[in-house]
From Swiss-Prot:
This is Phosphatidylserine decarboxylase proenzyme. The gene is psd. It is a peripheral membrane protein. Its EC number is 4.1.1.65. The active site is at residues 86, 143, 246. Its cofactor is pyruvate. Is synthesized initially as an inactive proenzyme. Formation of the active enzyme involves a self-maturation process in which the active site pyruvoyl group is generated from an internal serine residue via an autocatalytic post-translational modification. Two non-identical subunits are generated from the proenzyme in this reaction, and the pyruvate is formed at the N-terminus of the alpha chain, which is derived from the carboxyl end of the proenzyme. It comes from the Bacteria. Heterodimer of a large membrane-associated beta subunit and a small pyruvoyl-containing alpha subunit. One of its GO terms (molecular function) is phosphatidylserine decarboxylase activity.
Length: 280
């Protein structure tokens, strides 16, 4: 009975308010008392984090922790795209007729994901996509998958359904309905890319390094703006972070790419490992 009621319940929850409240709680000094329990529960490897766990002032600060520089080597080569995050591949494949796969029997469109811009969406038709789920135990900083220029970003307010198996299998067009922040990247030889950071239930917010854009704002409005100066970011450099677990979707325009060995549905990825390469 409980399992049958749960899918219906997630539609009725005040998801955004709950997530903002969670963000406030995890930012209190009191929350640091939960850090050691969090480490133990999720079996987090503290040997690779930037500083001792005792030096984090809040649970939110620990959650968005940085790693030691050598912890995530970046796969070299101008024709190699790397994983922007640590996580698990939930879906990947070709973008056929402007459609992405969420789960068996559940699809959604590129246009919906990018906020309804058909012009923006069409450049990815015939390209590739990969959806990577970040669990609460994962490293939650987001990095550049390639060296490229940041041309624009789009903030899309929405719901905050859970992005775990329960949400993916029971919420139609979940990733096109949840709040998200899209960064558009232009590269020298690998085509355009869109890095979509998807909000989720209990995600305090998503933040980026290139401006003050953030998510989970009360009464937030859709925004699409050019990024001042079109800054160039190197492959592997930090782009932003989640303040709790969530999902990243990477759209690749080029149809001349192939997935790297071991990049498959259900497989774990580390930030910086080879994701795709240009066909020889």
């Amino acid at each position: 009975m409980g399992k049958k009621l749960l899918p219906g319940l997630i539609h009725r929850l005040p998801q955004n308010a709950m997530s903002r409240t969670m963000g406030k709680i995890t930012a209190t000094p009191f929350s640091r008392l939960a850090i050691q329990r969090y480490i133990k529960h999720y079996q987090i490897d503290t040997s690779i984090i930037e500083k001792p766990a005792s030096e984090y002032r809040t649970l939110k600060e620990f959650f968005s922790r940085r790693l030691k520089p050598a912890a995530r080597p970046i796969a070299p080569g101008p024709d190699t795209i790397v994983s922007p995050v640590d996580g698990t591949v939930s879906q990947l494949g070709d973008i056929c007729e402007g459609t992405l796969i969420q789960a068996k029997g559940k699809d959604f469109s590129v246009s919906e994901l990018l906020g309804g811009s058909e012009e923006e969406a069409k450049r990815y038709y015939g390209g590739k996509f990969i959806t990577i789920y970040l669990s609460p135990r994962d490293y939650h900083r987001i990095h550049m998958p390639v060296t490229g220029d940041l041309s624009s970003y789009c903030y899309l307010p929405g719901r905050l359904y859970p992005v775990n198996k329960l949400g993916i299998e029971n919420v139609d067009r979940l990733f096109a309905r949840n709040e998200r922040l899209v960064t558009h990247i232009k590269t020298d030889s690998l085509g355009d890319m869109a890095l979509v950071k998807v909000g989720a239930l209990f995600v305090g917010s998503v933040k980026v390094c290139y401006n003050t854009a953030t998510t989970n704002i009360k009464h937030g409005r859709q925004t699409h703006e050019k990024i001042a100066g079109t800054p160039r970011y190197e492959k592997g450099s930090e782009l932003g972070w989640f303040e709790f677990g969530s999902t990243v979707i990477l759209l690749l325009e080029s149809n001349e790419l192939e997935w790297a060995t071991g990049v498959e549905k259900g497989k774990s990825l580390l930030m910086g490992q080879a994701l795709a390469t240009k066909k020889a």
